[in-house]
């Protein structure tokens, strides 16, 4: 264990890549170091400690992590550089070889970074690695963000028992596990007391909530959180379509606090490609969920994830995907190009898509997405929206988000931060922001 006296008057810089779950966990790491006397750096200060929380969902994500690690070491010369997160769990030796790295810490111990910081170790001694076996990760560790925004991220679940053929995340995060409803509700109440007005529920597979807690499931959690006073709005983070039940959708439509905002990973609109991916639903189920949302909440924001160019995605299957999406009432697509990942079952599937075809398919879906997003914006012009105003002064403007996740701007007013306003926007600027 580290002598905590070495932390006195030390400063830390934090870098986070990837998902909302990572942001929640980085905040938890920051709070644990603050309790030891380590404060966050201010602008233009040089840190004593750099913590980089990484992502490894694609090859590009790995590349961005390496770039960020080198950037942190360069901007904070002489600092103790710690790398954690999914990339650190999957490729610790690769990270340890990067110049300037002193500690690589895997998924299980990431929230215990303070216990492994040896600030007195010579900076030229090379990197040490703290990493256990992923299959041994069984404990759920609660995390939540605590930045200056009125929106907080709350981790309710971790890990994944699905083994989609293209994905490495179960190898990085371990088996599915979650907190209890009582634990999550207590944390939401604590966040409310700190002044938060909106909470985003995050995890790797949040719809799988309840593992290890008999009688508890995600629907029960949603209903319990809907009773938390002080929080005006809960957003359901990305949720698998087979776990987004009709009862959750129907409840959300009449709820006091659950936002009409859904993020649902489709991955492909071809049933054959879904089979190759080992996804747990078909296009008929996905369509039924989206159509029910649109029926009960006509102005809900529905974001859909799609991966293009996966192994086995022949041209005819991509066309099936495109035609399926053309008929689906979504609001926006999040399009990802397939990236081959070492150790995944997808590598055994024949028919690899060329980079050029991946790019063409991605561009087609991006155009479709932009058309739908503009349609969504136009449908909301002139409608009354409820906006929670956030921290931040952007050239004299402040930003907020509506219940259905439309960004809204108004002249900066510090007194408005954290307050709620009902507005009827009439103008959309070039950045996709409603102006009030």
Predicted regions and their residues:
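Alpha-helix N-cap/loop-to-helix initiation residues
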Residues: 22, 58-61, 88, 241, ...
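Residue-level signal for inorganic ion chemistry
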Residues: 51, 86, 113, 201, ...
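Conserved SAM/AdoMet-binding glycine-rich loop
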Residues: 81-82, 90-91, 193-318, 326
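Terminal RNA-binding accessory module
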Residues: 348-436
């Amino acid at each position: 264990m580290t002598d905590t006296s070495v932390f006195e008057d030390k400063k830390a810089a934090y870098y986070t890549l990837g998902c909302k779950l990572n942001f929640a966990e980085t905040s938890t790491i920051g709070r644990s170091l603050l309790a030891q006397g380590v404060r966050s750096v201010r602008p233009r200060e040089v840190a004593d400690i750099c913590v980089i929380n990484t992502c490894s969902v694609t090859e590009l994500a790995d590349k961005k992590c390496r770039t960020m690690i080198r950037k942190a070491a360069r901007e904070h010369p002489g600092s103790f550089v710690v790398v954690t997160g999914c990339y650190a769990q999957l490729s610790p030796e690769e990270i340890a070889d990067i110049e300037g790295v002193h500690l690589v810490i895997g998924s299980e111990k990431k929230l215990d970074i303070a216990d492994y910081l040896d600030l007195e170790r010579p900076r030229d001694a090379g990197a040490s690695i703290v990493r256990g076996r992923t299959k041994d990760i069984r404990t759920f560790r609660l995390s939540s963000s605590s930045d200056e925004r009125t929106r907080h991220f709350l981790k309710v679940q971790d890990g994944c028992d699905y083994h989609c053929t293209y994905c490495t995340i179960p190898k990085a995060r371990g088996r599915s596990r979650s907190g209890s409803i009582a634990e999550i509700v207590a944390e939401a109440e604590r966040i409310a007391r700190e002044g938060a007005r909106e909470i985003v529920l995050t995890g790797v597979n949040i719809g799988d909530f309840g593992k290890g807690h008999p009688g508890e499931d995600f629907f029960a959690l949603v209903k319990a959180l809907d009773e938390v006073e002080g929080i005006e709005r809960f957003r359901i983070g990305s949720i698998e379509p087979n776990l987004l039940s009709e009862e959750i959708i129907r409840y959300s439509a009449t709820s006091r606090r659950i936002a009409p905002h859904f993020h649902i990973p489709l991955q492909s609109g071809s049933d054959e490609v879904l089979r190759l991916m080992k996804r747990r639903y078909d296009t008929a189920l996905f369509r039924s969920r989206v159509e029910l949302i649109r029926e009960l909440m006509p102005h809900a924001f529905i974001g859909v994830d799609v991966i293009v160019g996966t192994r086995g995605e022949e041209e005819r299957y991509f066309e099936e995907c495109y035609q399926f999406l053309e008929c689906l009432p979504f609001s926006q697509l999040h399009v990802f190009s397939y990236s081959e990942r070492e150790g995944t079952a997808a590598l055994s599937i024949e028919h690899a898509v060329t980079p050029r075809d991946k790019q063409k398919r991605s561009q087609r879906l991006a155009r479709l997405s932009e058309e739908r997003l503009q349609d969504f914006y136009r449908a909301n012009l002139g409608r009354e929206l409820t906006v929670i105003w956030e921290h931040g002064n952007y050239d004299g403007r402040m930003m907020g988000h509506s219940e259905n996740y439309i960004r809204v701007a108004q002249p900066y007013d510090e007194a408005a931060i954290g307050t709620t306003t009902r507005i009827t926007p009439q103008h959309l600027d070039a950045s996709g922001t409603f102006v009030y």
